[in-house]
């Protein structure tokens, strides 16, 4: 979610510590839908570590922010404009990338030995939906 990305700077150090401890999940607190914290699985530790290192370096050079704007609204506007400017539209929009992540997560859980219903329920929770939303996740994200 875009708001999670923009506000994630508040959790970068915590996430870095989690990765260094070899945790398999990260807790997303800021910018979540309805303000409900959620946990999400780390599918690629190396990629997550690299993204965190890059984000921490950016925050250090931008007054502790990932987007150096005076308020959330202007930061969100900047985020959306920059995403479109670099081609994150259509099949590559941030929400489309969420779909792709969900499909990768479903495959990950299936490979871990979970059955399809379990995998969908876990992905529903990873996405910030309740565990009872597995059927919704199957309909929206689960076309694999």
Show where each model-derived region lies:
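C-terminal catalytic core of tyrosine-transesterase DNA break-rejoin enzymes
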Residues: 98-130
